[in-house]
């Protein structure tokens, strides 16, 4: 029987209708966060898609020292708390160190382990101690079967509810590719699988001082992942991605999201028909 992770009234499982995890790459301020959350909540409610809001208070692995990192943990969590209370939607956000886990868990329903940190045992253990759902992004440098080791660590630390996210694999320099087999391979671990359609089109460090990307392939990869049969679709979204402070080339334009989600719902239904 496939593992199902329950979050409030949301059920997350590879055999269930997909859940959308979406929001801007980083928190840019209260007004912007509330604007984006309102748009996404209304859209997902209209389309009857379960929704979890995602945004980061700190982009700790920016390519350049001059890259804008975000509003910081104190202000960021305050804003995410406002989003959560105003729109009654669950929250997922990144943690980068053990010291951030307890404070972040006071607001976030899901703690996300960044791909670059997915093997950091102390961070996994600190996240586990919060009792929250732990969502781990598979490192670009890892084979999908290597996530068994991450699962074993988390289970040893007492985590019952785990989500794994595929976000592409290194392919030469400044490039990622998505191997759709990895979704099925990780699903064999009996963990709900999420596909990160926007970071999968990244070109890490491809712009020299920042990360590049090609958002025209987001829809293509999202369709392919849905056809495999997954628990969740992860997309970073912005009303004006070309002027966003981080990951602009990868993020979906808010105005284009509805048409893509309508298609994904159709594909998801076909994939999961009994």
From Swiss-Prot:
EC annotation from Swiss-Prot or TrEMBL: 2.5.1.55
Compartments in which it is found: Cytoplasm
Chief place where the protein resides: cytoplasm
Keyword line: Cytoplasm, Lipopolysaccharide biosynthesis, Transferase
Coiled-coil residue windows: none
Pathway named in the protein's UniProt entry: Carbohydrate biosynthesis; 3-deoxy-D-manno-octulosonate biosynthesis; 3-deoxy-D-manno-octulosonate from D-ribulose 5-phosphate: step 2/3; Bacterial outer membrane biogenesis; lipopolysaccharide biosynthesis
Entry GO MF terms: 3-deoxy-8-phosphooctulonate synthase activity
SUPFAM superfamilies named among the record's database cross-references: Aldolase
Reaction(s) catalysed (UniProt annotation): D-arabinose 5-phosphate + phosphoenolpyruvate + H2O = 3-deoxy-alpha-D-manno-2-octulosonate-8-phosphate + phosphate
GO cellular component: cytoplasm
UniProt cross-references to Pfam families, sorted A to Z: DAHP_synth_1 (PF00793)
HAMAP family: KDO8P_synth
The family this protein is said to belong to: Belongs to the KdsA family.
NCBIfam families: KDO8P_synth (TIGR01362), PRK05198.1 (NF003543)
Protein name per UniProt: 2-dehydro-3-deoxyphosphooctonate aldolase
Species this protein is from: Rickettsia akari (strain Hartford)
């Amino acid at each position: 029987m496939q593992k199902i992770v329950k979050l409030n009234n949301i059920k997350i499982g590879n055999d269930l209708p997909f859940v959308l995890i979406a929001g801007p790459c980083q928190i840019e301020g209260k007004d912007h966060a509330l604007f984006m959350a309102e748009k996404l909540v209304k859209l997902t409610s209209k389309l009857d898609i379960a929704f979890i809001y995602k945004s980061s208070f700190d982009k700790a692995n920016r390519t350049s020292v001059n890259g804008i990192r975000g509003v910081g943990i104190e202000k960021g969590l305050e804003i995410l708390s406002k989003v959560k209370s105003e729109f009654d939607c669950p929250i997922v956000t990144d943690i980068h160190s053990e010291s951030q886990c307890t404070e972040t868990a006071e607001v976030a329903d899901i703690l996300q382990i960044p791909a670059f940190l997915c093997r950091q045992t102390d961070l996994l253990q600190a996240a586990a101690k919060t009792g929250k759902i732990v969502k781990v992004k598979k490192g670009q440098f890892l084979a999908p079967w290597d996530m068994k080791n991450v699962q074993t660590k988390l289970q040893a630390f007492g985590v019952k509810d785990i989500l794994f996210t595929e976000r592409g694999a290194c392919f030469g320099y400044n490039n990622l590719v998505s191997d759709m087999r990895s979704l099925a391979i990780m699903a064999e671990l009996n963990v709900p699988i999420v596909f990160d359609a926007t970071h999968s089109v990244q070109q890490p460090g491809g712009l020299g001082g920042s990360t590049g990307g090609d958002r025209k392939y987001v829809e293509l990869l999202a369709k392919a992942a849905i056809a495999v049969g997954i628990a969740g679709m992860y997309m970073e979204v912005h009303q004006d991605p070309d002027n966003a402070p981080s990951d602009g080339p990868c993020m979906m334009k808010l105005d284009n999201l509805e048409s893509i989600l309508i298609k994904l719902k159709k594909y998801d239904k076909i994939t999961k028909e009994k």
